[in-house]
Amino acid sequence: MAAAATATAGTKGVVRQVIGPVLDVEFPAGKLPKILNALRIDGKNPSGQHIAITAEVQQLLGDHRVRAVAMSSTDGLVRGMEALDTGSAISVPVGEATLGRIFNVLGEPVDEQGPVTTDATAPIHRPAPKLTELETKPTVFETGIKVIDLLAPYRQGGKVGLFGGAGVGKTVLIQELINNIAKEHGGVSVFGGVGERTREGNDLYEEFKESGVINSDDLSKSKVALCFGQMNEPPGARMRVGLSALTMAEHFRDVNKQDVLLFIDNIFRFVQAGSEVSALLGRMPSAVGYQPTLGTDVGALQERITSTLEGSITSIQAVYVPADDLTDPAPATTFAHLDATTVLARALAAKGIYPAVDPLDSTSTMLQPSVVGDEHYRTARSVQATLQRYKELQDIIAILGLDELSEDDRRTVDRARKIEKFLSQPFFVAEIFTGMSGKYVKLEETIAGFNMILAGELDHLPEQAFYLVGNIDEVKAKAEKIASEAKG
């Protein structure tokens, strides 16, 4: 639904000062726009250059003036130009028409695919759902990815931090999650590109088209909407684009009653942009130069990402940690909101184990017996204990070799290597690259499979049979194939 316009809608003001992306606008007495209202400047400057800028009111200064932050470059903007109060917050298009399209912070399509065919819009600023509307019972969000579902399960309507360097498979993991939620949960996804490189956004879009997540022939069959505010854009755009993406996701949850995946890449850039805007507005900086409203800004975004009785928004947020300092106020504030962390390890990617999710570093608040049940909890902890023991033994193996280990330790190493291989699986979105059909593994099958490995029931099977397969039945079939090839 469109934002309700205030009584000041249509009031015209005059630009009195421009300082970079910040502008002061004077309005008639008694006609000041509200904070967070969008102002529209659309006209020609004295040089004849056409200027079209949307700015958001941030402060009321007195003397009939407001201070606003521009959502696009203010190049060419001069004093004396006319500014129109729209009477409402920035609004973006919502609904099925957004699928397969790329938008900027204002909800304008930037993919050269023509206008968006919808009249449905929603304001980017709105309160979080009331407590009475929330689904408070913790429910595991099944992804079909073994390592995540077993060791660091996602919460439906929860928030997950995704950590990983370049080239370890973040994008492929994101694509697989988008694919799986569409197929298994009938849900859609929204991708918010916040302050990252334009090249990365373009690459992601092309990969989405290649893997079928975006259907170029029929956009309505696409599974994702994209909303980008890249690092070359003013801080106002980077600060608000996360809210634009979230607003699109909320429509799918509240109106279509769907389960939605919201990706934010990168949540740190959202905080960084808020810090820049805060300094431009003349606020006193807080610790490490961040804005004094850091906790409020992050909370305003995170509290809207939740499960309601109608549907859910599960958020996966890439987290950049400046200088690897986890105590920095930006990541530290973000961590307080996360339910799970998925850590991608370069060492696993180097071994060819995909997804390269670190089974020992990844965590989840859902992994407790009261939520996932005793069997799941025991299996996950036994898998982690086996892998931890293998990690401890690796130095001994490197120096003395396997033969110097005790019988028990040799058995542990053998099972740990099978577990490590079994934590890999082929992805649907990678079929075109690997030639292997993707696998979605149900949680019960995952637990049963790892229990069999831990119990020693599969000690006789070769290690290679566990690599890049779905469930245990496929392991047995692959082992038979390996045996027959060896004979032949």
UniProtKB/Swiss-Prot annotation:
Cite the Gene3D superfamilies for this sequence: 2.40.10.170, Bovine Mitochondrial F1-atpase, Atp Synthase Beta Chain, Chain D, domain 3 (1.10.1140.10), P-loop containing nucleotide triphosphate hydrolases (3.40.50.300)
Catalytic activity entry:
ATP + H2O + 4 H(+)(in) = ADP + phosphate + 5 H(+)(out)
A Pfam family? ATP-synt_VA_C
- Tell me where it mainly resides: membrane
Which keywords fit this entry according to its UniProt record?
ATP synthesis, ATP-binding, CF(1), Hydrogen ion transport, Ion transport, Membrane, Nucleotide-binding, Thylakoid, Translocase, Transport
Task: Tell me which EC number(s) this protein carries.
Answer: 7.1.2.2
Any one GO CC term of the record = plasma membrane-derived thylakoid membrane
Q: Which InterPro entries match?
A: AAA+_ATPase, ATP-synt_VA_C, ATP_synth_F1_bsu, ATPase_a/bsu_AS, ATPase_alpha/beta_chains, ATPase_F1/V1/A1_a/bsu_N, ATPase_F1/V1/A1_a/bsu_N_sf, ATPase_F1/V1/A1_a/bsu_nucl-bd
Q: Name one GO molecular function term.
A: ATP hydrolysis activity
Q: Which residues bind ATP?
A: G164, G165, A166, G167, V168, G169, K170, T171
The way this protein sits in the membrane is described as: Peripheral membrane protein
Q: Where in the cell is it found?
A: Cellular thylakoid membrane
Record keywords: Phosphoprotein included?
no
Subunit field text: F-type ATPases have 2 components, CF(1) - the catalytic core - and CF(0) - the membrane proton channel. CF(1) has five subunits: alpha(3), beta(3), gamma(1), delta(1), epsilon(1). CF(0) has four main subunits: a(1), b(1), b'(1) and c(9-12).
Query: What job does this protein perform?
Result: Produces ATP from ADP in the presence of a proton gradient across the membrane. The catalytic sites are hosted primarily by the beta subunits.
Tell me the protein family, please. Answer: Belongs to the ATPase alpha/beta chains family.
- Recorded protein name is ATP synthase subunit beta
- Give the species this sequence originates from: Prochlorococcus marinus (strain MIT 9303)
